[in-house]
From Swiss-Prot:
Keywords: Aminoacyl-tRNA synthetase, ATP-binding, Cytoplasm, Ligase, Nucleotide-binding, Protein biosynthesis. A motif ('KMSKS' region) lies at residues 650-654. InterPro entries: aa-tRNA-synth_I_CS, aa-tRNA-synth_Ia, Leu-tRNA-ligase, Leu_tRNA-synth_edit, M/V/L/I-tRNA-synth_anticd-bd, Methionyl/Leucyl_tRNA_Synth, Rossmann-like_a/b/a_fold, tRNAsynth_Ia_anticodon-bd. A motif ('HIGH' region) lies at residues 73-83. HAMAP family: Leu_tRNA_synth_B. It is found in: Cytoplasm. GO terms for cellular component: cytosol. Its main location: cytoplasm. It comes from Shigella flexneri. This is Leucine--tRNA ligase. The gene is leuS. PANTHER family: LEUCINE--TRNA LIGASE, MITOCHONDRIAL, LEUCYL-TRNA SYNTHETASE.
Length: 860
């Protein structure tokens, strides 16, 4: 064994061994308990970033630990390879998205191997290959035949820069999440999957997910947004149709003083024919941002349509306004307004001088003061005719029942959730497998024409999708008739909604999934990824699992038992102000800093001498140029050091602050472990451990070893507090470094302790542990070694600490044998100088003894 720890030598050697032995390749084995550990698959952007490294290190630690418990562990990896960035990069680099993507995959695969992650590479998949997306296309055609897919024209968020549709969640402050361009509204035909048909199940089954973070479940609950209410129909004077609204507060219905419709509503369109002001307003609304977060904060505007609706219960005529806060795609495109008891309606009514009628009493029973704001709390009705005096629930039911009896109301359950629009007007995605015949019939692409292959050898102009620009690509024949293929491609969330299941049978040629393999491995035991995916990917992931279950492919209801959302990785951020007042962000690697005595940064400059402004720690990002390249760190310190720092610096679900001093600390610790093993093995062979022949000191050290095993096992396995597990191993190492190594049993005990330490560290730092295990003559490879088991007998304390009080005041703490009697404890206490001092010349009137804990002598 060499004296110095040289990670660059051992890591590549160990990685080669894993590759040659195919150590982490697994197959279904009914005789073993399975464990499926999955990290969210990466987008092949070109290089790994620290967020990836953190995510995949957590997964690898869990997978290696479960493997050491004797389980059949599947940990696969693949590439979420379709998507918009590839198109931009292709244009910029004068290439096509496919070669750019495949080059990135090759590069990032090497980076993953360099970090020592124990993946089953035989299951690697890339979602941009026809071998993968053909099954997604086939499944889509089957969903269409089941009535779960439809096409409709809908108003969408359109990014003029990316030339694509954005989901509501992808619009941030009215701008595209990716390029910050102002989003427009546009009507285009799109394909939808009926996720709303599964809304109730998606909502109710959240209760089955005991090991998912509450924050994620709450976000999904709110996103699905189930509500119970009443749909009410209004007659409208001089208009051919009725207006239907949905309300969750029918108890306030007697206070409804106006209706509001979306600018795109047929009633508003009709009114605009003779109303130039309204026509201009409708035009303005067409380009209004539509994401709900913006709806809440934007200025509420409207125009009177001139139409009057008739209140079904009072017979009063109430005005109908077109308003920018009502959306056609939400509910019926019309809402009833109760300005006395809804703040948005109140602000709108106040702005335009509309009637405000209070119908709910304040909590103290008085009429509410509506001079400043609406009263939004529930309460007792007044000013409501026959419903006066009813509380919220009674009024809800009474008004709902009356409207139903009159034939103008119906109780309804509504959802905020909208069907999933899966059409994208981009090139680099899976083609949607639908065709339009000459006679206008739309139908699924026949099975014998699947997959519809996306051509990869294309020229990108940065504006039009190559398959839209090439009229020949769309031409095909179905049943002898000329037909045109759909030129839209799938939303890339389609591919990432079922990849976890395909990992169970990546080579399967007969269909989307081999049910036998899928049902052996699924559900995923732990899924690891960022909380930013809570309402998009993680909802579609659950939805797709239910679709596959209903197609008979899987027999579980949910795709993953546990979800672990890792925290973000932060780093210092610095900038200087350029000549034009712009901020130039400088990498923390290039910042020369001065710190105060507490280690805080007080001054910074770069190599060119610019005075830098320090903005604190923020998420590693390209925009702030504060990303740290994992490859540079691995080359400098070794993969094991980077992994250890990642797991030690912070709990897995909290933010992690990147500090190179912390990385250096992790490196020093591994050098200490190496040194201790080197010194131990240099002394030659070791005798067998004889636990009956150990001295008190040796027993105490062995007790520490086994208590550490018990703690680390609990921290990794049950609590998943990996940082405290590492801290416990470090504490034990400090004790081992000071332990005597001269006697035969000292060395035998050290051998047991070091073999335990190396196995406990193995999930975190597998390369060094692989090597040290061989040096310690462990049986076989450490990859197949069992996790150490704590010896209960070794953990039993021989002695205990007893607090000695005189008249309730602590005077001493004494160590006594565990089985000491009260008399022996009193005798031992009397030998303590501080106790004897207070007993001198006084009578002990009473003795209070709590065995093994407390002795209180009451004297007088």
């Amino acid at each position: 064994m060499q004296e110095q720890y040289r990670p660059e030598e051992i890591e590549s050697k160990v990685q080669l061994h894993w590759d040659e032995k195919r150590t982490f390749e697994v197959t279904e084995d009914e005789s073993k308990e399975k464990y499926y550990c999955l990290s969210m698959l990466p987008y092949p952007s070109g290089r790994l970033h620290m967020g990836h490294v953190r995510n995949y290190t957590i997964g690898d630690v869990i997978a290696r630990y479960q493997r050491m418990l004797g389980k059949n562990v599947l940990q696969p990896i693949g590439w979420d390879a379709f998507g918009l960035p590839a198109e931009g990069a292709a244009v910029k680099n004068n290439t096509a998205p496919a070669p750019w993507t495949y080059d990135n995959i090759a590069y990032m695969k090497n980076q993953l191997k360099m970090l020592g992650f124990g993946y089953d590479w035989s299951r690697e998949l890339a979602t941009c290959t026809p071998e993968y997306y053909r099954w997604e296309q086939k499944f889509f055609t089957e969903l269409y035949k089941k009535g779960l897919v439809y096409k409709k024209t809908s108003a969408v968020n359109w990014c003029p820069n990316d030339q694509t549709v954005l989901a509501n969640e992808q619009v941030i402050d009215g701008c595209c999440w990716r390029c910050d361009t102002k989003v427009e509204r546009k009507e285009i035909p799109q394909w939808f999957i009926k996720i709303t048909a599964y809304a109730d199940e998606l909502l109710n089954d959240l209760d089955k997910l005991d090991h998912w973070p509450d924050t994620v479940k709450t976000m999904q609950r709110n996103w699905i947004g189930r509500s119970e209410g009443v749909e009410i129909t209004f007659n409208v004077n001089d208009y051919d149709n009725t207006l239907t609204v949905y309300t969750t507060r029918p108890d306030t219905f007697m206070g409804c003083t106006y209706l509001a419709v979306a600018a795109g509503h047929p009633l508003a369109q009709k009114a605009a024919e003779n109303n130039p002001e309204l026509a201009a307003f409708i035009d303005e609304c067409r380009n209004t941002k539509v994401a709900e977060a913006e709806m809440a904060t934007m200025e509420k505007k409207g125009v009177d349509t001139g139409f009057k609706a008739v209140h079904p219960l009072t017979g009063e005529e109430i005005p109908v306004w077109a308003a920018n806060f009502v959306l056609m795609e939400y509910g019926t495109g019309a809402v009833m307004a109760v300005p006395g008891h809804d703040q948005r309606d109140y602000e709108f009514a106040s702005k335009y001088g509309l009637n405000i009628k209070p119908v709910i009493l304040a909590a103290d029973g008085s009429e509410p003061d509506l001079s400043q704001q609406a009263l939004t709390e529930k309460g007792v009705l007044f000013n409501s005719g026959e419903f006066n005096g009813l509380d919220h629930e009674a009024a809800f039911n009474a008004i709902a029942d009356k409207l139903t009896a009159m034939g103008v109301g119906e109780r309804k359950v509504n959802y905020r959730l909208r069907d999933w629009g899966v059409s994208r007007q981009r090139y680099w995605g899976a083609p949607i497998p639908m065709v339009t015949l000459e006679d206008g019939t739309v139908m699924p692409t026949p099975d014998d024409q699947l997959p519809v292959i996306l051509p990869e050898d294309v020229v990108m102009d940065g504006i039009t999708s190559p398959i839209k620009a090439d009229p020949e690509w769309a031409k095909t024949t179905v049943n002898g008739m000329p037909a045109l293929r759909e030129t839209d491609t799938f939303d890339t969330f389609m591919e990432s909604s079922w990849y976890y299941a395909r990992y169970t049978c990546p080579e399967y040629k007969e269909g989307m999934l081999d049910s036998e393999a899928a049902n052996y491995w699924l559900p995923v035991d732990i899924y690891i990824g960022g909380i930013e995916h809570a309402i998009m990917h993680l909802l579609y992931f659950r939805f797709f699992h239910k679709l596959m279950r209903d197609a008979g492919m899987v027999n579980s209801d949910e795709p993953a038992k546990q979800l672990l959302c890792q925290g973000m990785v932060l780093a210092d951020a610095f900038y200087y102000v350029g000549e034009n007042g712009e901020r130039n962000w400088v990498s923390p690697v290039d910042a020369i800093v001065e710190r105060d005595e507490k280690g805080r940064i007080v001054k910074a400059k770069d190599a060119a001498g610019h005075e830098l402004v320090y903005t604190g720690m923020s998420k590693m990002s390209k925009s702030k140029n504060n990303g740290i390249d994992p490859q540079v760190m691995v080359e400098r310190y070794g993969a094991d050091t980077v992994r250890l720092f990642m797991m030690f610096a912070s709990p897995a679900d909290m933010t992690l602050e990147w500090q190179e001093s912390g990385v250096e600390g992790a490196n020093r610790f591994l050098k200490r472990v190496w040194k201790l093993v080197y010194e131990h093995t240099a002394k030659g062979d070791v005798a067998a451990l004889n636990v009956d022949a150990l001295t008190e000191d040796q027993k105490a050290l062995r007790r520490d070893v086994h208590k550490t095993i018990a703690k680390v096992t609990d921290d990794i396995g049950r609590r998943q507090t990996f940082n405290t597990a590492i801290a416990a191993i470090m504490e034990l190492m400090n004790k081992l470094a000071k332990a005597p190594t001269d006697g035969e049993q000292d060395r035998a005990l050290m051998q047991e302790a070091l073999q335990a330490v190396v196995r406990m560290l193995n999930p975190f730092t597998p390369h060094i542990c692989f090597t040290l295990w061989q040096e310690l003559k462990g049986e076989g490879d450490i990859d197949n070694a069992p996790w150490p088991v704590a010896d209960e007998k070794a953990m039993v304390e021989d002695s205990t600490l007893v607090v000695v009080q005189v008249n309730g005041k602590v005077r001493a703490k004494i160590t006594v044998p565990v089985d000491a009697t009260e008399e022996q404890v009193r005798e031992r206490a009397g030998q303590e100088h501080l106790v004897a001092k207070y007993l001198d010349g006084v009578t002990v009137r009473k003795v209070i003894y709590v065995p093994g804990k407390l002795l209180n002598l009451v004297v007088g």
